[in-house]
UniProtKB/Swiss-Prot annotation:
Family matches, as InterPro entries: Corona_NS4
Domain of life of the source: Viruses
Keywords annotated in UniProt: Host membrane, Membrane, Transmembrane, Transmembrane helix
Subcellular location: Host membrane
Keyword Membrane: yes
Transmembrane segments: 12-32
Protein name: Non-structural protein 4
Pfam family, one: Corona_NS4
Family affiliation: Belongs to the coronaviruses ns4/ns4.8 protein family.
Lipid bilayer topology: Single-pass membrane protein
Main location: host cell
Listed GO CC annotations: host cell membrane; membrane
Length: 124
């Protein structure tokens, strides 16, 4: 067996165990990451759902109105007598259905300008 010099002995004693320790450390880090992925620990940090907003109103909004070309203003009245508490904004009004878009039918509060005997019927 050959006799190792002092430099070779230093390398064999310190560098070899250092390489083994580095390999063990890398292996432990890999196993820790694998365990985190298996138990979905990272999912508790991320936001996975899309945020949504629902607007509610406590009081009845301002009654919509229609103005003709000659400047006459008519108040639009919903033909139904009951409202839900959910108000979906100016374009959709009250939503009385459980799902889907709602088409609102309005009638005017007074007879039309030409006095035909029937109020205007508007659909939004």
């Amino acid at each position: 067996m050959a006799v190792l010099g002092p430099k070779a002995t230093l390398a064999a004693v310190f560098i070899g165990p250092f390489i083994v320790a580095c390999m063990l450390g890398i292996g432990l880090v890999y196993l820790l990451q694998l365990q985190v992925q298996i138990f979905h620990v990272k999912d508790t940090i991320r936001v996975t759902g899309k945020p949504a907003t629902v607007s509610y109103t406590i009081s009845t909004p301002v009654t919509p109105s229609a103005t003709t070309l000659d400047g006459t203003t008519y108040t639009l009245i919903r033909p139904t007598s009951s409202y839900t508490r959910v108000y979906l904004g100016k374009t959709r009004g009250f939503d009385t259905s459980t799902f889907g878009p709602k088409v609102l039918d309005y009638i005017t509060s007074s007879k039309p300008h030409l006095n035909s005997g029937r109020p205007y019927s508007l659909s939004c």
